[in-house]
Amino acid sequence: MTTLFFIEHANGQVSDQSLKAISATSQIDGDVHGLIVGSDIDSVVAEASKIEGLSKLMHVDDDSFNNILAENLTQLILNVSGDYEYFLAAATTTGKNVMPRLAAKLDVSQISEIIAIEGPDTFIRTIYAGNAIATVQTSDPKKVLTVRPTAFKSAAMGSSGCEITKINAENMPSISEFIGEELTKSDRPELTSAKTIISGGRGMQNGENFELLDKVAEKLGAAVGASRAAVDAGFVPNDYQVGQTGKVVAPELYLSLIHISEPTRQW
């Protein structure tokens, strides 16, 4: 059994979400291969090759992967899919965009946001907004999975790299093109990887009061989150939202202020 894990990167570094999610592969027997794509990514390829547990790293250095499109990445994985039984990625925006398409192309079911692996065909995931845990068994010959990063610790980095292979981007579809993106800039840590989070709800009453949380967060080195009600009221932008319809978080310290209900939905 061989596993292929898609590794994401940003700003010249392997993403924290991928480092955590790839730890799930240690619960699967057999070799683990990584796939990383982009252009001018020699330094991040060198870093990724040192992830413990990887026996091989494939990379594509091509301008067409400067911005990930589901159609292109899916086709790239399909080009090498014959060698693999398991396909994993972190349950990020990219992972949630690509893996369902891959599953459809392979004519198998996709299992979302697993938090543990019990056996070769048995996986654990949360349901009902985290209030119940489901054990899912599949008879599909190929398993396509997204992994909840917050359920795993970051993979260790070794002192030497694994085998590195460069592959070519061939037969890439052209049914969509990247137009642009708008990124929110913040001095605060990213919510999904923050160790400390301070979060406010509708009781904050307005956006000006939310700025008080920023001052506390600065002292704590924390990220700032918000409930859906606070976001819907326009107090803060959408990317602040935590919970069932927002970002899944698992900090070491979570401070929930001013009317945030059902905190289990935030984990």
Predicted regions and their residues:
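Short, glycine-rich nucleotide/cofactor-binding loops
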Residues: T3-S18, Q205
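Histidine-anchored nucleotide/phosphate-binding helix
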Residues: D16-I28
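Short internal beta-strands
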Residues: V32-S39, G225-S227
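A glycine-rich helix N-cap at a beta->alpha junction
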Residues: E47-A70
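N-terminal glycine-rich phosphate/adenylate-binding segment common to multiple enzyme folds
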Residues: F65-A151
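Phosphate/diphosphate-binding glycine-rich loops and adjacent basic-rich segments that engage nucleotide
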Residues: A129-P189
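Glycine-rich phosphate/diphosphate-binding loops and the adjacent beta-loop-alpha structural elements
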Residues: L183-Q244
